[in-house]
From Swiss-Prot:
It is found in: Virion; Host nucleus. Residues 25-35 have a biased composition (Polar residues). Residues 166-183 have a biased composition (Gly residues). This is Capsid protein VP1. The capsids of autonomous parvoviruses expose a proportion of VP2 N-terminus and part of that sequence can be cleaved of to form VP3. SUPFAM superfamilies: ssDNA viruses. It comes from Canine parvovirus type 2 (isolate Dog/United States/CPV-N/1978) (CPV-2). The N-terminus of VP1 is sequestered within the mature capsid. It contains a phospholipase A2-like region and nuclear localization signals that might be exposed by capsid modifications during virus entry.
Length: 727
């Protein structure tokens, strides 16, 4: 007889939990709630400390702080008790030092040695005080701030000894930061790690690194700029060319990594969409390191030559808007995120935001004289909102060798499906019983219900007939909805195209035609266009959503008749029929059946150019989804990261002389690194038949490898090829 299976140690765990309490083992299965999940992560971190020779029970550790942060909004009693227990421990226990900021839950974290510094560094280090020298040694041995938890106050971490006021900055003429000139302060990592967990879950850690080039701003001033292109829109029929708006142009730049192509290469994405059924967005962190600042001067010779010098006293200004004070400006909508190629330097986009500007546009038509009427109302004083980073967000000053880390942001988003649905209203529920089945193969041999339509049993909402058919049977809800198709609406700031949920809407499949609100992307060489392309014309593609919205815009129609009477022309409205005698305006332009019975899928992730997450609207009635990103952050989203080369003035600067400062031409190169963590569910096969998966043909294969002069491109990939039932 086999010995009984050894049971996992339960420890002192209260009822309803598996990990919240001391003495339990780490193999109790899936946590029961978010507090229990935080306790499991806390236990795994403690195990990592113990393996590295540290005793976390006697000290307050970063793992304790992380548990406090994760349970600060806990609704369950166990999470609340654990939260206040570790807050009490924080108040009385000494801090655990010389440990990783965030021990890995998958393997022990070991300090990593940096490259040996040049000899002159030791001369500078020898002059330091004993305490300062010890701190430098710890900084040189400590790993990067991967996994550092962003504190409640949202303050990032800056590794810069000058900020301590101890006079322990590294040598090098007043610059050099904590690492010093010649000492690397970080690692370059673009690997995607897949960690397979219990019950079909996978933890996906996407690492991304880029060399970022930043020039000093054209001006140090904020500017309010109005764009007026009435020369384009003054002609009848050119309303779609309207660009009139107002914006604030700032001296800052935005480091935006909110696009799928920043994080995953084409091979990674193929693996994800072929094997996973859904994605959960977990956490995000980023940092700046190995900052380099240089000045540019020109010689007086003819022709002049440029001279580049390291400036160890110049500064890079960095600001993290962790509280989302600034206007939210995702750069993916303009294809201005960080580049998609890890080996190619990239640039941050100049940061700007919209400013209130009212106007009225009355379009003209052939029956009127003159041009379209534009009435400018300007800015309403009641609506003025002018934001500046300098007095709204803490600004950190980095010099050569310094580094900056944001800490970890944890998302609160609904999951994103990697499967599509095909069922429309006609495929919901129990099909009719067939009295007659085909007796031979062939497409012309059909089944037959065999019962007269008015003799069948079932439920309809047709009050004037007893017919029960596939057209009249009552379904539980409405799959999809008819939406305004290619429609423009008016707002107080000008016309806009009505956003609609994308989905497979009919027979149109050409990439230059959006079948039913399918997004069309235009992008340049940093974001997928062939890298050896010449000229300014961007490359484009239309993402044809694979899922079915339940609607057929090209063949749609509306019928409103007495059901038991013959159909007349006046009782049916076709897509080509005009409304109110207006030629070309029909019900598909204005008809909307969205309502409380509507069932709708989320938008698909669009690789590589699509946006990943979006900010929730600050309105009382929230939209159920956003058409530009599958993940909508509840309450808050990751803070935007702004950078700017600080003014490097000359002795000729006179604040009263002109609007432009007398500045030394200065630019910065720095390394950016981020980590984006997902949890994914492995897709289980429940059908007998195999399914289509993301693949490429022989011709497309060579898009992903360079040519003899380095030319290559990224082709968009489908993300929801596997079908699923919705009912």
């Amino acid at each position: 007889m086999a010995p009984p299976a050894k049971r996992a140690r339960r420890g002192l765990v209260p009822p309803g939990y598996k990990y919240l309490g001391p003495g339990n083992s780490l193999d109790q299965g899936e946590p029961t709630n978010p507090s229990d999940a935080a306790a499991k992560e806390h236990d795994e971190a403690y195990a990592a400390y113990l393996r590295s020779g540290k005793n976390p029970y006697l000290y307050f550790s970063p793992a304790d702080q992380r548990f406090i942060d994760q349970t600060k909004d806990a609704k369950d009693w166990g999470g609340k008790i654990g939260h206040y227990f570790f807050r009490a421990k924080k108040a009385i226990a000494p801090v655990l030092t010389d440990t990783p900021d965030h021990p890995s839950t998958s393997r022990p974290t070991k300090p990593t040695k940096r490259s040996k510094p040049p000899p002159h560094i030791f001369i500078n280090l020898a002059k330091k005080k004993k305490a300062g020298a010890g701190q430098v040694k710890r900084d040189n041995l400590a790993p990067m701030s991967d996994g550092a938890v962003q504190p409640d106050g949202g303050q990032p971490a800056v590794r810069n000894e000058r900020a301590t006021g101890s006079g322990n900055g590294s040598g090098g003429g007043g610059g050099g930061g904590s690492g010093g000139v010649g000492i690397s302060t970080g690692t370059f990592n673009n690997q995607t790690e897949f960690k397979f967990l219990e019950n079909g879950w996978v933890e996906i850690t996407a690492n991304s690194s880029r060399l970022v080039h930043l020039n000093m701003p054209e001006s140090e001033n904020y500017r309010r700029v109005v764009v007026n292109n009435m020369d384009k829109t003054a002609v009848n029929g050119n309303m779609a060319l309207d660009d009139i708006h107002a914006q604030i142009v700032t001296p800052w730049s935005l480091v935006d990594a909110n696009a799928w192509g920043v994080w995953f290469n084409p091979g990674d994405w193929q693996l994800i969409v072929n094997t996973m059924s859904e994605l959960h967005l977990v956490s995000f962190e980023q940092e700046i390191f190995n900052v380099v600042l240089k000045t540019v001067s020109e010689s007086a010779t003819q022709p002049p030559t440029k001279v580049y010098n390291n400036d160890l006293t110049a500064s890079l200004m960095v600001a993290l808007d962790s509280n989302n004070t600034m206007p939210f400006t995702p750069a993916a909508m303009r294809s201005e995120t960080l580049g998609f190629y890890p080996w190619k330097p990239t640039i941050p986009t100049p940061w700007r935001y919209y400013f209130q500007w009212d106007r009225t546009l009355i379009p003209s038509h052939t029956g009127t004289s003159g041009t379209p009427t534009n009435i400018y109302h300007g800015t309403d004083p009641d609506d003025v909102q002018f934001y500046t980073i300098e007095n709204s967000v803490p600004v950190h000053l980095l010099r050569t060798g310094d580094e900056f880390a944001t800490g970890t942001f944890f998302f609160d988003c609904k999951p994103c499906r990697l499967t599509h649905t095909w069922q429309t209203n006609r495929a919901l529920g129990l099909p009719p019983f067939l009295n007659s089945l085909p007796q031979s193969e062939g497409a012309t041999n059909f089944g037959d219900i065999g019962v007269q339509q008015d003799k069948r049993r079932g439920v309809t909402q047709m009050g004037n007939t007893n017919y029960i058919t596939e057209a009249t049977i009552m379904r539980p809800a409405e799959v999809g909805y008819s939406a305004p198709y290619y429609s423009f609406e008016a707002s107080t700031q000008g016309p806009f195209k009505t956003p609609i949920a994308a989905g497979r809407g009919g027979a149109q499949t050409y990439e230059n035609q959006a079948a039913d609100g399918d997004p069309r992307y235009a992008f340049g060489r940093q974001h997928g266009q062939k890298t050896t392309t010449t000229g300014e014309t961007p490359e484009r593609f239309t993402y044809i959503a694979h899922q079915d919205t339940g609607r057929y815009p090209e063949g749609d129609w509306i019928q409103n008749i007495n059901f038991n009477l013959p159909v007349t022309n006046d009782n049916v409205l076709l897509p080509t029929d005009p409304i109110g005698g207006k030629t070309g305006i029909n019900y598909t332009n204005i008809f909307n059946t969205y309502g409380p019975l509507t069932a709708l899928n989320n938008v698909p992730p669009v690789y590589p150019n699509g946006q990943i997450w979006d900010k929730e609207f600050d309105t009382d009635l929230k939209p159920r989804l956003h058409v530009n990103a599958p993940f909508v952050c509840q309450n808050n989203c990751p803070g935007q990261l702004f950078v700017k080369v600080a003014p490097n003035l000359t002795n000729e600067y006179d604040p009263d002389a002109s609007a432009n400062m007398s500045r030394i031409v200065t630019y910065s190169d720095f390394w950016w690194k981020g980590k984006l963590v997902f949890k994914a569910k492995l897709r289980a096969s429940h059908t007998w038949n195999p399914i289509q998966q993301m693949s490429i043909n022989v011709d497309n294969q060579f898009n992903y490898v360079p040519s003899n002069i380095g030319g290559m491109k990224i082709v968009y990939e489908k993300s929801q090829l596997a079908p699923r039932k919705l009912y």
